[in-house]
Amino acid sequence: HGVIMLGLTGLFDETLQKPVKASLVTIFKSYGEALCHKKLFIFAACVGLVSVFSYCFAAAAPFIAQNILHLNAADYGYWNILNMVGMFCGAIVASRLIKKYESVQILLAAITIIILGFIVMGLFSVTGTLTTIGFFGITAIAYFVSSWIFPTASHIASNAVDCKANASGAMNFINMGSAVLMVAIMGYLPFEALWGFIGVVLVFAVLCFIGVVTIFLKSNLKLEIYFQ
């Protein structure tokens, strides 16, 4: 599929102001530059947070449902409807939020909600008060705000460099790569499925939050210096 797509690139017009010759050396160099771009990397990782949460949930939730919540397959399927409802409603709300607030503000709010949600899930687990509605309620909220993260983070990441194609390719690589890596790490952690799920998503979300805040503060500092 990739070879076919590469072969068809000659059919498209050049969109860059300074045309760049299509060659393997140029392609790898451009992808390398895109992957090393801090802003693109951080916001692509935020897109990856959505995949990390979704993939880790898909891997861990069946074990959590069976061993901790004591649900059968049918009940697990019914409770999963909450997640689909959360995702659907989140997409509707996201379209309205984007019109009123800055993308970074929406992104930080969504990541903060995920962090707080997983902290609460951990507290429920420690105190032995984690219920089915508590677990799926928190994951439904996480799916709800994940619908805010994807459009805002992907928009910022794809516009971080001049070449949108390279930005998109690098973003998707970071997105899927982070998801695969975190699922693999979760599988090797010496904890039960619930704590592996909480730990991996929580740590990744905190790292994304720190990265976005760092970029945001640096950009504000540059603006202040410029206006002075």
Residue ranges of model-derived segments:
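Pair of pore-lining "gating" transmembrane helices in MFS-fold secondary transporters
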Residues: C36-C56, A140
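Short amphipathic helix-loop junctions that connect adjacent transmembrane helices
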Residues: A60-A74
